[in-house]
Amino acid sequence: MKNIRNFSIIAHIDHGKSTLSDRLIQMCGGLSEREMQAQVLDSMDLERERGITIKAQSVTLDYKANDGETYQLNFIDTPGHVDFSYEVSRSLAACEGALLVVDAGQGVEAQTLANCYTALEMNLEVVPVLNKIDLPQAEPERVAEEIEDIVGIDAMDAVRCSAKTGLGVDDVLEEIVKRIPAPEGDPDAPLQALIIDSWFDDYLGVVSLVRIKNGSLKKNDKIKVMSTGQTWGVDRLGISTPKQKDTLALNCGEVGWVVCGIKDIHGAPVGDTLTLAKNGAESALPGFKKVKPQVYAGLFPISSDDYESFRDALEKLSLNDASLFYEPENSTALGFGFRCGFLGMLHMEIIQERLEREYDLDLITTAPTVVYEIVQTDGTIIHIDSPSNLPAINNIQELREPIAECNILVPQDYLGNVITLCIEKRGVQTNMVYHGNQVALTYEIPMAEVVLDFFDRLKSTSRGYASLDYGFKRFDAADMVRLDIMINGERVDALAIITHKDNAPFRGRQLVEKMRELIPRQMFDIAIQAAIGNHIIARSTVKAMRKDVLAKCYGGDVSRKKKLLNKQKEGKKRMKSVGRVDVPQEAFLAILHVGKDN
């Protein structure tokens, strides 16, 4: 056990975590030259295309150190996006240390800070690493000072390396062996194994990634899942080197995968504890705090025949992604579907894309909303995540919206732009600290404004230099209203949104205009209205297509023309009373993008 080192790699987006992982694998001979490829751990197609890490991946390597001993390194490559920070905290729970990778050109960013504090709260040893020192704009001295100044850990002797060229990577390995403590635990105690992650394999069933805290786990052991009490036999177990490699046992302190032939998707939830069926441990390990979804949206299959396969796909995906929440929902406009909860807009995009790709589904998404807290007139408090669940206005005593605390790091040159953006998003500044050339801002901004497009706007106003980290703070009373879109006098439930009263007329006009462009012309006029309750605040009309009924009258008497025109009018009127308007697919998507173009 004294030769095992468990650590995670944490960093801001694009600071070179996955490339550093590649080098570590290469130096320790985890894969042959032929199998090596760039970002070998980002195995999903989506990850490769977008160049981001979405799932944390674990690897076990053997490293022969300078002191002549061979060490077993178990490391986990983690995502950098704020939407996937729960993946990071889960990975850290399985480790004794973390490599804090900082880009020597860019310096400390908000996500570096957030992840580092998570690691320090869990009492992990944090080893700073300055990456990308081969770049001409690298300033390792300044960045080391910045780490000490902003993060508050000693960084003067931080390892300098370039993961791309492989320079200094052996120093990183030596630092890991020297500074990160060996795992604690009792090999003779009853087995306690923490499930860090699980995924569904079509042939093996549920595969779980576990960290053995106490005891050891062997092939053919009978094990028990502590939360459900079910028992299973261990069919296979092993380590990833990143290839799956079978072993006969996992010992105390190791990280590996286990297959027990569990077919039920909820058989081994993430954060649960495995123990032996006979003489097992009494108590479970402390799991992870459940993450609450911040954004909710309705997902509906385009053809209702896909509903069953959509449900199966969601079940399989939620096993792999512990923070996805879903419940059935039906809508008069879109039929049966699910109300899903996500951690942010990127998370929502990724999930939708994974469902469409990996499970061949065609989906429609409704406008995303956050969770609102409502005090009803009888004093009861309810939480709603969908505009259609909003009670009638005379039953609401107070409507409270969620406020997010945002930590923004920005270079001084862009400070003005960022402050203007925060004010536009109804933000309130609570703190501002200067660190050299960087400014750390703390704002309280309504969650609805943050999740929609705040991140994109922040990046564009600061030319990509500002970085953001946010978390839920509290609920505050606010003047919010439900904005309905009516088409020919009928409310379309899937188009309703909840918005601030001051923005409502503007949002209403924008939506109505957008709808007018997207709804195809019919044989009769279509009225598109935006309404708050019974009060119409915006309207536009899709004009009818009409036939020129006077074409065959040359000259002729005016009464003859009137007769033909009136006959046409009557027909249109009759048509309007029976005609139905189908809202096209694009109209639902347009709601998501309204307000981004201006």
Curated annotation (Swiss-Prot):
Enzyme class: hydrolase
Localization annotation: Cell inner membrane
Keywords per UniProt: Cell inner membrane, Cell membrane, GTP-binding, Hydrolase, Membrane, Nucleotide-binding, Protein biosynthesis
Keyword field contains Membrane: yes
Span of domain tr-type G: 2-184
A single GO molecular function term of this UniProt record: ribosome binding
Catalysed reactions, semicolon-separated: GTP + H2O = GDP + phosphate + H(+)
A Pfam family that the UniProt record links to this protein: GTP_EFTU_D2
Full protein name: Elongation factor 4
Organism name: Tolumonas auensis (strain DSM 9187 / NBRC 110442 / TA 4)
